[in-house]
Structures are given as structure tokens and as C-alpha cells.
Amino acid sequence: MSDLQAIADRVEIEALRGEFTDASMMRDWDRFASLFTLDGVWRMPHIDVELVGREEIRAEVERLRGLWQYFVQTVHPGTIELAGDSAVGRAYVAEFGRFRDGTSNLNYAVYHDRYARTPDGWRFAERAYEVRYVDSTPLAGSAPDVAERAR
């Protein structure tokens, strides 16, 4: 693999990780699911969830996000190890929000990823979420209402 190809692959994988967060924050469920290979796997062991394939992933992310009054996720760069048309990596995540039932969640986690090069670009073959810290202290803040954000 050429140095230029390796640089391009790293940039594309980093963009994929950014698209994941953006699709979630913008509630674009079709785009979110399209970031996985057709048989991609999304694991969240802390809530006993393992999803296989784009249809399952799309349905569950929409269901899960429906539980939140508001939700914020930020992702920080991690590692990427390239191996031809596949790669592995980690991304570091901070999430917080309040559920519709009034409980709150703040966590710091690591995504353990496997990536695959496809005709449509790099996609997640597997994404496994490992929570490293969790805090359920009630959040005092709030999210602006949608009408207010539109101003």
C-alpha cells in the first residue's frame, strides 16, 4: 500500500466515524444504517444489544433515540490500523442526555471497530461499545426546544 493510499484510507475512516455521530445527532437513520456493511454488527453489551445488518441497526437506533428527551455525543480520534481492504481501530466517546422518563446519563466509552472497504467506501463491519465510566446524576441543564433552535 502506498503512503498516499494509507493517508487517504485514514482520512476516509476518520470521516466515517464523524458521519456516525453526525447521522445520530441529526436523526438521519437511513444514513446511520448505511455506514455499516450489509452484514455489519453493532454491539452495546452494557444494555445487552447486538444488531446484525442495516435493517436491524436502523430500527434499533431510531427506537433507542426515541427514549431520549435530548442526547449529545462527541467522538475523539483514536487509533486506526490498516490491513489492505480491512482495518481495525478505536474511537473515544463522551455522551450525555436525559431520558424521557426524567433519568439522566453521562458516560465515557470506547468504540472498538472493524472497518471494511466496500465499493461505496469504508464502512463499519463491526462497532462494539465499551462503557468505561457512567454517571446517572440528574443533569441540571436542558436542550432548547426545536422552535427556539429554528430562530
Q: Can you name each region flagged by the protein language model?
A:
Residues 9, 13, 53, 107:
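Hydrophobic (often cysteine-bearing) scaffold residues that line and stabilize catalytic clefts
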Residues 29-93:
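A solvent-exposed, acidic/Ser-Thr-rich amphipathic alpha-helical stretch
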Residues 3, 7, 48-51, 102:
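Charge-dense, low-complexity intrinsically disordered segments
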Residues 1-34, 38:
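Short, low-complexity N-terminal intrinsically disordered segments enriched in polar/charged residues
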Residues 64-151:
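A beta-strand edge to alpha-helix "cap/lid" segment located at domain peripheries
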